[in-house]
Amino acid sequence: EGGIEVTNEIKKVMIETEIELFSDYDCDPFYSDRPIPFTETELGEVKTISAPHMIITLLHNMELLEEQEVIIIGSKGGYLAALVAQLIGEKGIVRVLDTCANVISHSKQRLTHWPTIEFRELESIEVSPVAFPGEFDRVLITGHIEELPNWITSRISDTGFVIAPLGPENNQHLMKIERQ
C-alpha cells in the first residue's frame, strides 16, 4: 500500500525465510511491520532487524541480480544477508561487515549453513578491511552514516552503487550513490 513494489522474488524469499531463526526475542511485532531486537551488545545497545517495509524498500532499491557480489555493512541479525543470498543465487556472494563482534558472532551462528555468506568484523566504518577484494557491485549500509568513507566510494564499479541512510542521526535520507 505504501507504493514500494514487492516483486514476486522478494515476497517469496521473505515468506520462506523464518524471522524466528534470526532472533530469540518475540517476533510478533515484525508481523505488524515493526522492527524487532535480535541481540544486545556488551555495552547494552539493542540491535534490531528492520521492519518488513524497510527491508522491502532496501531490497527493491538494491536492484539485485543473480551472481552479484553484495556487501552489507550492518548485520541486522543475518536476516537481510539470508534474503539477499537467495535473491542473488548460489553463484553470488554476500559479504557482511559489522563493527560489533557480538553481532558478527550472532549472525554467523544463524547462518552456518549458508556457504555464499561471509562475515568480517570492521575496525571502523572509516577503515577499509584488510585484503578486501575488488570493486563493489552493490553496497548496502543499514545504519545511518553522515558521509561515505573513501574506501567505499573509490571502489564502486561502473555499474555499481551504494544504498545508505545518509545524514545526521535525526535527519537521514535513504540515498543511492553511484560512481562519480
Q: Regions from the language model: what does each represent?
A:
Residues 1-87, 102-106, 111-113:
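Class I SAM-dependent transferase core
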Residues 59, 63-180:
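Conserved nucleotide-cofactor-binding alpha/beta core module
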